[in-house]
C-alpha cells in the first residue's frame, strides 16, 4: 500500500517559525523562535493545531494562500 505524506497548510508566520525550528533541530540556529505577542500567538496555535504541527514537522508544510 502506498502511503501519501500529509503536508498541512499553515499561515505564513507559522511557516517562518517552523523553518527556524527546523534549523534549530539541525543545529544551524541558536536564537529564540518567538518573542512577545508572537510567542502568545504561537503557543495558542500549537495548542489548537497540535496535529497539524505534528505532521508539519514530520512531512513538511505548505503556506496558506491569503
From Swiss-Prot:
It comes from the Bacteria. This is SPbeta prophage-derived uncharacterized protein YosK.
Amino acid at each position: 500500500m502506498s502511503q501519501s505524506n500529509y503536508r498541512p497548510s499553515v499561515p505564513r508566520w507559522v511557516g517562518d517559525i517552523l523553518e527556524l525550528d527546523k534549523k534549530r533541530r539541525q543545529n544551524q540556529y541558536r536564537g529564540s523562535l518567538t518573542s512577545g505577542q508572537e510567542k502568545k500567538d504561537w503557543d495558542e496555535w500549537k495548542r489548537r493545531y497540535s496535529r497539524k504541527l505534528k505532521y508539519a514537522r514530520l512531512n513538511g508544510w505548505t503556506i496558506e494562500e491569503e
